[in-house]
Amino acid sequence: MKFLLSFVVLAVFSASAFAKESPPKIQVYSRNPGEFGKENTLICHVSDFHPPDITIDLLKNGEVIPNAEQTDLAFEKGWKFHLTKSVSFTPTSNDKFTCRVRHLKETKNISWEPDM
């Protein structure tokens, strides 16, 4: 088992060393249509990035929202990676919700649009 795990880790890092740098594609949305005052789930899906060194934060009015859950790092064809982070939230008209993604030396902030 240890040998297999070591082999997989070595294969991922060896192959990723040859992959080209790629900035992330970021999508911010909610599980259900946005409705002020109703509990929902805020989701930030980040895909097509390489290398896998990345940080995702979900923010409410510029502050990190606690208790957010993140999927395990997964890779796609061409050694590009994807991650999803989500958290329960109750939107109000006064709050701004954002997904902040740090990849390599760049930081991007994408706001959630409530579609109301």
UniProtKB/Swiss-Prot annotation:
Residues 1-19 form the signal peptide. PROSITE patterns: IG_LIKE, IG_MHC. Pfam families: C1-set (PF07654). InterPro entries: Ig-like_dom, Ig-like_dom_sf, Ig-like_fold, Ig/MHC_CS, Ig_C1-set, MHC/Immunoglobulin. GO terms for biological process: antigen processing and presentation of peptide antigen via MHC class I. Residues 24-111 form the Ig-like C1-type domain. It is found in: Secreted. Keywords: Disulfide bond, Immunity, Immunoglobulin domain, MHC I, Secreted, Signal. One of its GO terms (cellular component) is extracellular region. SUPFAM superfamilies: Immunoglobulin (SSF48726). Its main location: secreted. Disulfide bonds join C44-C99. The keyword Signal applies. It comes from the Eukaryota. Belongs to the beta-2-microglobulin family. Heterodimer of an alpha chain and a beta chain. Beta-2-microglobulin is the beta-chain of major histocompatibility complex class I molecules. Component of the class I major histocompatibility complex (MHC). Involved in the presentation of peptide antigens to the immune system. This is Beta-2-microglobulin. It comes from Ictalurus punctatus (Channel catfish). The gene is b2m.
